Amino acid sequence: MNTELKLISMRDIQTEDVQWLWYPYLPRGKLTIVQGDPGEGKTTFVLAVISALTRGEPLPECEQAPEPVNVIYQTAEDGLADTIKPRLEAAGADCARVLVIDESKRELNLSDERLEQALRKTGAQLMVLDPIQAYLGDGVDMHRANEVRPILKRTAAMAERTGCAVILIGHMNKAQGLKSGYRGLGSIDFRAAARSVLVVGRLKDDPAVRIVAQDKNSLAPEGKSIAFQLDGERGFKWKGTCDLSVDDVLSGSGKLQTKTLQMEEELERMLREAATAEAVLNRAKELGVSERTLMTAKKNLGIVSEKRGSQWYWMLPEQGDVYKRQHWHWPCCG
């Protein structure tokens, strides 16, 4: 079959700036891969991102709060009613903005026209497919580049047409000693098609803390690694940025140091007894901690604010409970 030759002059191409849903981790209109070993917190991390985006709250390293967005979330591993919705609610997501394509009569795959239909109908700015291998389609060998490449090319084209950021969640293979680029499950074409690749892992010294490290960024300088914690009592908590590398994450080695953790330790020391909000703010400035990081540390520790006379005081939650019992007539303000 003969195809008419058509040439495009680069002179006629109108340049465009890359648009970001979360700079520099999640570009609009492009594919992003989030990968890690099973049980390391990939889905938990993505659900936390969804929670912030649906509420219009800034993510780590973002200076301004974005407008709330709709999200399409497809999962083949977890139940919607008993797992995904409870986790979204625990993360504080606006569940009215999280939409799922009904697969009860026909399963989805990346070549399914319903994906783009859903994006156009809802105006969703993010689509998540978890895990990627479940959406390749029947008979597709994820290790064969000639089978994977055309599927990813179509998915990337859909993302570009709609301007939607697409996250593909995947597992790592079990091979040790390989470069991070070759630890992804399946063909290397998955990595090649993605403009951003994020790796999630935990540290051996503190298994409750997970690290998200950017392993690839084709559109901007690679972002800082981000720490988060899965706390049995307080749930998901962002713990700030750090200098740990992808290799540190994959090996579980390295010492975690972030401004958020530093401020949490300082607050626990300062607030053995209640301290004025002014004193806390001054101490944060001395340590070079931003007000936003300070507020994150305050939220993570559950610190309460009480007004005594004309001054505001900060105290740890257990101190706040005692204080309210003793001075019930003073108002409690957040």
Predicted ranges, named:
Residues 54:
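Gly/Ala-rich phosphate-binding loop of Rossmann-like dinucleotide-binding domains
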